[in-house]
């Protein structure tokens, strides 16, 4: 779904800069809720498509929580297919990523949200601090900035996209700064205070 958001942001950004190509476009606007809704629809369509391919190629697709109690055996302990036990020679764990939460900070899905919750945000924020400048954080920074949100991107390590090489990261960081994203590297977030209207914090080098 994040790639669908990026597609909308990329198109809007190109229209905003169309005069560079000699094309004048007036009266362009966007509907944030529709952009979010489209990304969810795309995700749903893809999931159905994958399900069809599984069935077509005779791949068993079980839904639930897999638990490995003994080597070579997986038990579905919760979910639709609870109770099924699979015996196999090899087990490949590809469970995806889980957002890491900051200690002593309650995630309410409104003022403080995980990346998964951000995929379903109902209202565009006027400003946002994104903690973590990895691929997911960078995607959200680009998306929200393209539609006018004031974005501060914070990373504890010394460059954005910390798992990528420095040269690639430097190009991305330079581009972000040119687009107006406030990139804070080698920076930690401390003293976070959340109230009904805003979130305040200290950014410490």
Predicted regions and their residues:
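Conserved beta-loop-beta element that borders a ligand/cofactor-binding pocket
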Residues: 148-150
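Gly/Ala-rich phosphate-binding loop of Rossmann-like dinucleotide-binding domains
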Residues: 141-146
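N-terminal Rossmann-fold NAD(P) dinucleotide-binding loop
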Residues: 137-138
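Glycine-rich flavin
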Residues: 1-124, 152, 157-161, 165-168, ...
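Glycine-rich Rossmann-fold phosphate-binding loop(s) that bind the pyrophosphate
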Residues: 131-134, 164
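Hydrophobic Val/Ile/Leu positions in short beta-strands of Rossmann-like dinucleotide-binding domains
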Residues: 129-130, 153
């Amino acid at each position: 779904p994040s790639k669908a958001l990026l597609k909308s942001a990329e198109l809007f950004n190109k229209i905003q800069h169309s005069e560079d190509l000699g094309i004048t476009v007036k009266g362009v606007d966007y509907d944030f809720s529709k952009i979010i809704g489209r990304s969810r629809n795309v995700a749903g369509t893809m999931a159905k498509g994958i399900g069809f391919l599984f069935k077509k190629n005779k791949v068993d697709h079980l839904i639930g929580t897999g638990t490995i109690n003994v080597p070579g055996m997986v038990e579905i302990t919760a979910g639709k297919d609870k109770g099924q036990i699979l015996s196999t020679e090899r087990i490949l764990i590809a469970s995806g990523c889980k957002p890491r939460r900051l200690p002593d900070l309650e995630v309410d899905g409104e003022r403080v949200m995980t990346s998964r919750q951000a995929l379903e945000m109902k209202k565009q924020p006027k400003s946002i601090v994104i903690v973590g400048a990895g691929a997911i954080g960078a995607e959200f920074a680009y998306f929200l900035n393209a539609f006018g949100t004031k974005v501060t991107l914070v990373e504890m390590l010394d460059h954005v996209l910390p798992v990528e090489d420095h040269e690639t990261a430097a190009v991305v960081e330079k581009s972000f700064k040119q687009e107006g994203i406030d990139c804070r590297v080698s920076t930690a977030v401390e003293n976070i205070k959340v109230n009904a209207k805003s979130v305040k914090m200290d950014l410490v080098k």
